[in-house]
Regions:
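AAA+/SF3 P-loop NTPase mechanochemical coupling elements
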Residues: 113-119, 155-173
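A short helix-turn-beta junction within AAA+ P-loop NTPase domains corresponding to the substrate/partner-engaging
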Residues: 181-192
């Protein structure tokens, strides 16, 4: 798959136009199968699956080409071994490099201090998130802020806090069946 994804990057010139149709995926059957297994397994029709896959590819394309903050997080939940980390590693870490892709745990989000990893990343993978739906849940509020705001409070232990630009997009991965609280009107999350 590593060689295949490398060719995909070269052929698509940084993913420009990637999200316009799925025909180009015919040249990458393993990647197409992987993406469909990860994002379309709950779809009832081919049309629904294609629309869902196009949405994911558009999200990726705009992240890669414009380094655009999408203000909507991709939430991937499922059993172990479904490919959540592989998706991030195969596409995002390969494109942005490990240096600009940060993995933040549930425990780091619970902390009063900000993970130093967030200061310079372009993609934040929130890994093994577990839903805590009590009122006043600071993790839930922190996640919402990191997804949508253009700045975030950067607070290190023993130092004054400051606000930094928030360029990164968020992918939330979890084995939990309900990793995050999403209402019917939520605009911040696309759950797969």
């Amino acid at each position: 798959i590593d060689n295949i994804s490398g060719n995909l990057f070269e052929d698509q010139k940084g993913f420009q136009g990637l999200h316009q149709d799925l025909k180009f995926l015919e040249n990458y059957p393993y990647i197409e199968k992987f993406l469909r297994n990860l994002f379309c397994y709950q779809c009832d029709t081919q049309k629904e699956a294609d629309e869902r896959l196009l949405w994911v590819l558009a999200w990726m394309s705009k992240s890669f080409v414009n380094y655009d903050k999408r203000r909507t997080a991709i939430v991937i939940h499922g059993a172990e071994g479904t490919g959540k980390d592989t998706f991030v590693n195969l596409f995002f870490k390969r494109y942005f490099s490990e240096k600009f892709c940060s993995v933040v745990s549930n425990e780091e989000l619970k902390s009063n201090f900000t993970s130093q990893k967030l200061a310079s990343c372009l993609l934040c993978q929130m890994n093994e998130i577990k839903g805590d739906f009590r009122d006043g849940n600071t993790v839930f509020d922190k996640i919402k802020t990191l997804i949508t705001e253009r700045e975030f409070k950067y607070e290190l232990k023993g130092q004054n806090s400051l606000y930094l630009p928030c360029y990164f997009n968020v992918i939330i991965c979890s084995n939990d069946t309900k990793p995050i609280q999403v209402s019917d009107t939520a605009r911040r999350y696309s759950v797969f």
